[in-house]
A protein has these predicted regions:
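Active-site microenvironments that recognize anionic phosphate/pyrophosphate groups
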Residues: 1-195, 201-271
């Protein structure tokens, strides 16, 4: 008979649940249903020609849903999400920048991480297994302009956004195992505010996809003595068939294994 999982996080707290069929984990954030919604249920909404909206929670000087007042920021600005999907108050697990994650794990370490799900199946033997997840969520406003998306920015404005991404990731990596920069585009994809912005999620657990990719790269390096993505970049550049652009520091390609029509993979020239 199956036992019962020891860890049972509060129903309204961030946690992850194990898929009993695959052994993989899914992160849930029940408390997110309480956040305010300024998006739309079906139609795409995008502010055009409006530089300031007095009702926008992200415009400079406006009051957010939690009562805090935004500063009169003049460039890209980041702050902790008022309604975060993750919290660092539960299951804190500080991981240094040289621990597992972001391509720095050894093969043995990565194998250990990827088998967390299988180990849970073997030890807990429960179909309803969950555990707390610790993390931090940041919101990044690209510009004080309510309608200026990334595609409308100047090169210097884009550079400022990229610099903010770098600064945020560098700081969060000192504590969390995984840091993800992303943007939900459009109301149907979960964008609750039309003011151009992105997000960063930092979490103390590794996503399944990241663990699998790290395992593959570690195994390739052990057998070939060369970084997998370094070899792949060189092969794509030689072929030229799927190249999008190549610069002094980066190459962008449509990956050979692309799932989506406009999928691109950025490959750095230094590591």
């Amino acid at each position: 008979m199956y036992g019962v999982c020891v860890t049972v996080p509060p129903a309204d707290s961030p946690h992850r649940r194990r898929n009993a069929l695959t052994g993989e984990w899914v992160t849930l954030s029940p408390q997110r249903t309480k956040r305010p919604w300024q998006g739309d249920e079906a139609e795409e909404i995008e502010a055009t020609g409006v530089t300031y909206d007095p009702d926008c929670y992200l415009c400079p000087g406006n009051t957010r849903a939690n009562g805090l007042v935004n500063p009169d920021y003049s460039g890209p600005w980041a702050f902790d999400n008022d309604f975060p999907a993750l919290s660092d108050g539960i299951g804190a697990n500080e991981i240094g920048p040289n621990e597992i994650g972001l391509g720095k794990a050894s093969l043995d370490e990565t194998r250990s991480a990827v088998t967390e799900g299988q180990a849970a199946v073997a030890t807990e033997r429960s179909l309803f297994c969950s555990e707390p997840v610790s993390g931090r969520c940041r919101v990044l406003c690209y510009s004080p302009d309510h309608s200026k998306t990334l595609t409308k920015m100047t090169e210097s404005e884009l550079s400022a956004v990229v610099q903010l991404w770098s600064d945020e990731v560098r700081q969060l990596r000192q504590q969390y195992r995984w840091v993800q920069v992303f943007e939900n585009k459009g109301a149907m994809m979960g964008c609750s505010n039309p003011h151009p912005h992105g997000q960063i999620w930092a979490v103390d657990t590794l996503p399944t996809e990241a663990v699998k990719e790290s395992m593959t790269q570690a195994a390739w390096f052990e057998s070939q003595g060369r970084l997998l993505l370094d070899q792949y970049r060189a092969d794509e550049e030689h072929s030229g068939e799927r190249m999008v652009v190549a610069t002094e520091h980066w190459s962008a390609v449509v990956p050979y294994w692309a799932t989506w029509p406009f999928e691109t993979l950025l490959l750095p020239r230094r590591h």
